């Protein structure tokens, strides 16, 4: 029967791979994801989540399970097509995919053609989700992930100060407001998982990502990060704090070296660098964690059973799924050089506790070595089911099997970057500014001044602001040309 279905697939259009109309799968109060005409346990919204996970796992093939363990980068980076095509039935994701990252958010090949007006991007994600629900055998929905450390990483979403600026506010209530704005805009646009907050501790100013941290203090980072996680997940999204663990103190401040400074002792590692993550997991209940690409004491974190299982799951009780930072898995093989083959690489990260591999390369670059590692006995079927089950559990908790099409494809502009959200942005910007010294009462500037010198490399910059891991093409201009213009809400 499987051979017959595969043969027919080549002859049928993308909208008619399965017998009958795909509209028939949408029943009253449930969806017939596997298209068998029967309400299976995993399709029953009233069934307990653990029962739904177990039922779905029991129906999955090895190919379908391994496809859940990879990210497909969207927006033309890896996923070259803007919309589903008939050729997708020949791609490895014909058996599903774990998540799709940054699809139609304004970055990558497609730019603004899909991301704005906002309704365009919602319709795009809905059509891609519809393909996975209707054209794959079991119809497992995709988790649409995106960045969001300073506002949602989407074209013209509401921007906030970088996390170092947010940290300077020392305002937990404000961080919760920022989280709600980010979550509301993500929900309106159909994203389901936000890669935030960054909980790395910045104590070496040479490190190039200091600006992305809440600061140098683990209590501050933990308290603010907790509010961000609670705020995102209160709106039905998954929060994925990063980068776990001990990532922000590389030797010489060199991020690309991937080597944690050997002077970081175990006690310092636990009380300083791990404490914000512990709080995010145990006190805020984060559903995701992103593993980092550095090592600690010579062991790559993304391939460490101690970090991903003993600490994260056994000590802290983490119940979500672990996604790797981009290329963190491959670094075991290419930078850390502790695995002689790609199969050994796949086996080490999965056995350690990693659920989903992310990289800017096709998902089969990981899925195929993963399958070979399983066939060679390097990964047990029990471990495979455990890792895939953790992914599915999060998808059930997000409600993707009850409503695979979140988002407002009609009027998302009433939510995204609305006036109320701009007010929160302005409030955060003002509170993030800290005056350390005011020699000769220079501030506030006298209204009697006739001239103000605007000096620096961006003095005449007229392009819209592009930030790291926040809104793309934000309508903010900082230049000599615009400084004399009156402030307008749309410039926030």
Feature-to-residue mapping (PLM):
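Glycoside hydrolase catalytic-domain context in secreted enzymes
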Residues: 18-484
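Short, linear, compositionally biased motifs with a strong N-terminal bias
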Residues: 10-11, 490
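Positively charged n-region of N-terminal signal peptides that target proteins for export
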Residues: 1-4
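Positively charged, low-complexity/disordered segments
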Residues: 485-488, 492
């Amino acid at each position: 029967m499987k051979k017959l279905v595969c043969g027919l697939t080549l002859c049928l259009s993308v909208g008619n791979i399965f017998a009958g109309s795909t509209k028939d799968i949408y029943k009253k109060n449930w969806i017939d994801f596997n298209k068998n005409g029967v309400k299976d346990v995993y399709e029953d919204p009233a069934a307990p989540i653990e029962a739904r996970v177990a039922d779905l796992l029991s129906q999955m093939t090895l190919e379908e399970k391994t496809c859940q363990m990879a990210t497909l980068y969207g927006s033309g980076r890896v996923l070259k097509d803007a919309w589903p095509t008939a050729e997708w039935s020949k791609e490895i994701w014909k058996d599903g995919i774990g998540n799709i990252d940054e699809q139609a958010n304004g970055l990558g090949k497609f730019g603004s053609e899909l991301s704005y007006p906002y309704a365009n991007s919602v319709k795009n994600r809905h059509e891609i989700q519809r393909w996975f629900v209707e054209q794959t055998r079991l119809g497992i929905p995709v988790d649409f992930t995106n960045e969001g450390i300073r506002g949602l990483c989407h074209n013209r979403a509401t921007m906030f100060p970088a996390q170092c600026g947010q940290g300077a506010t020392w305002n937990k209530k404000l961080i919760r407001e920022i989280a709600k704005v980010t979550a509301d805009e993500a929900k309106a646009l159909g994203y389901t998982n936000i890669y935030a907050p960054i909980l790395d501790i910045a104590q070496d100013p040479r490190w190039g990502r200091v600006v992305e941290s809440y600061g140098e203090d683990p209590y501050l980072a933990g308290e603010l990060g907790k509010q961000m996680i609670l705020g995102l997940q209160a709106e039905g999204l998954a929060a994925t704090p990063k980068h776990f663990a001990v990532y922000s103190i590389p030797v010489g401040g060199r991020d690309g070296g991937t080597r944690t400074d050997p002077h970081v002792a175990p006690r310092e590692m636990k009380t300083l660098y791990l404490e914000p993550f512990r709080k995010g997991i145990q006190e805020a209940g984060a559903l995701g964690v992103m593993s980092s690409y550095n090592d600690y004491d010579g062991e790559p974190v993304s391939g460490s059973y101690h970090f991903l299982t003993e600490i994260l799951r056994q000590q802290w009780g983490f119940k979500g799924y672990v996604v790797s930072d981009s290329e963190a898995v491959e670094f075991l093989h290419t930078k850390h050089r502790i695995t002689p083959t790609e199969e050994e690489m796949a086996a080490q990260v999965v056995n350690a506790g990693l659920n989903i591999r992310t990289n800017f390369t096709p998902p089969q670059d990981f899925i195929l070595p993963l399958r070979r590692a399983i066939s060679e006995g390097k990964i047990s079927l029990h471990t495979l089911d455990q890792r895939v089950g953790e992914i599915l559990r999060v998808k059930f908790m997000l409600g993707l099997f009850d409503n695979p099409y979140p988002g407002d494809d009609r009027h998302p502009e009433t939510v995204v970057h609305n006036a109320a959200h701009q007010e929160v942005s302005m409030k955060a910007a003002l509170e993030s500014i800290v005056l350390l010294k005011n020699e000769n009462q220079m501030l506030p500037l006298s209204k009697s001044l006739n001239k103000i010198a605007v000096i620096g490399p961006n003095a005449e910059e007229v392009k819209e602001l592009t930030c790291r891991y926040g809104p793309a093409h934000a309508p903010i201009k900082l230049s000599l040309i615009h400084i004399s213009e009156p402030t307008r809400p749309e410039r926030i």
